[in-house]
Amino acid sequence: MAPCTLWRCCQRTVGWVPVLFITFVVVWSYYAYVVELCVFTLSGNGENGKAVVYLVAFHLFFVMFVWSYWMTIFTSPASPSKEFCLSNSEKERYEKEFSQERQQEILRRAARDLPIYTTSASKTVRYCERCQLIKPDRAHHCSACDMCILKMDHHCPWVNNCVGFSNYKFFLLFLFYSLLYCLFVATTVLQYFIKFWTNELTDTRAKFHVLFLFFVSTMFFISVLSLLSYHCWLVGKNRTTIESFRAPMFSYGTDGNGFSLGCSKNWRQVFGDEKKYWLLPVFSSQGDGCSFPTRLVGTDPEQASVSNQSESARSIGSNQPFPIKPLSESKNRLLDSDPQWLESGSEEGVGGSGTNNHVTVAIEN
């Protein structure tokens, strides 16, 4: 086995360690709450009615939390469609060229009919040498997944998966339901935590689980609250984690709110128009992940045309293919109008959650 293949296998194996840790904590919390608290402590003290109410509410939060977590982990990241790949002849010409200017000319012609409005910082076509494709707007190469991810937000070790266009809604719901889960557990355990702490209750075995359950749920609540608040702010601004650290550069300059259409429309881009699906971990996000409306809509007829097509693309339900609009109908006048591309600049993907040093997004004149 080649060293690089062995190393990648080790990476994939180690990547499941954080997921197994979270799974262990969740399974233990289920046992501690259901068995030690509700069955032994509450029922043992004649509080059967309260135990039933607690169990019903607990399982509601537990099911939604596990469902969202599962979807975040096992939803495959969406990658660019074949329209963004170079043809065999274009790829052959590109590989034979030693001049970066000539390579960029080949990429520019290939990207002319694609709905692309972003470039690298040096005004070059964003091309992934590893995947051998032209990157759509907001797409980036993830070194951990070894593929280009549509609307990549970050690679999250706690789910061992890339968070992007296909599962960003699931990730937000995972944070939301984990927050509610921890809050519910902490608030309902608190009074028994006090009783065990003051030795009013003397069950030694249940005491350990109840005391530890309160500390763990409170700790995770504080941690998840800060992370969820940050991502809610990102959704309201229509930014990814990558874009929050490096604002996209448009034809008029750097603008961190370049993709923002207003708070309401920004939220609907992630959660969709159907309110009945908002709190369910099923795919309902707007668009196809390959093109996104910007604040240029209304002033640039070409951009408006692309945006209208993107708005009409919907997919509801998990594990369904994402509809791709006919790219040939969306000629990119921005790329076509630029007569010359500057020297190519490199661009890296993101390999970990919360990093700030990988991506530049820009739009050419």
Curated annotation (Swiss-Prot):
Superkingdom of the source species: Eukaryota
Gene for this chain: ZDHHC20
EC number: 2.3.1.225, 2.3.1.-
Biased composition (Polar residues): 302-321
Lumenal side: 36-53, 191-207
Residue positions binding Zn(2+) 2: 142, 145, 155, 162
A GO-annotated cellular component: plasma membrane
Main location per the UniProt record: Golgi
GO molecular function terms noted in the UniProt entry: protein-cysteine S-myristoyltransferase activity; protein-cysteine S-palmitoyltransferase activity; protein-cysteine S-stearoyltransferase activity; zinc ion binding
Topological region Cytoplasmic: 1-14, 75-169, 232-365
Protein name: Palmitoyltransferase ZDHHC20
InterPro entries in alphabetical order: Palmitoyltrfase_DHHC, PFA4/ZDH16/20/ERF2-like
Modifications made to the protein after synthesis: Autopalmitoylated (in vitro).
UniProt topology in membrane: Multi-pass membrane protein
Comment block on domains: The DHHC domain is required for palmitoyltransferase activity.
Annotated localization: Golgi apparatus membrane; Cell membrane; Cytoplasm, Perinuclear region; Endoplasmic reticulum membrane
UniProt binding sites for Zn(2+) 1: 128, 131, 141, 148
Organism: Bos taurus (Bovine)
Record-annotated active site: 156 (s-palmitoyl cysteine intermediate)
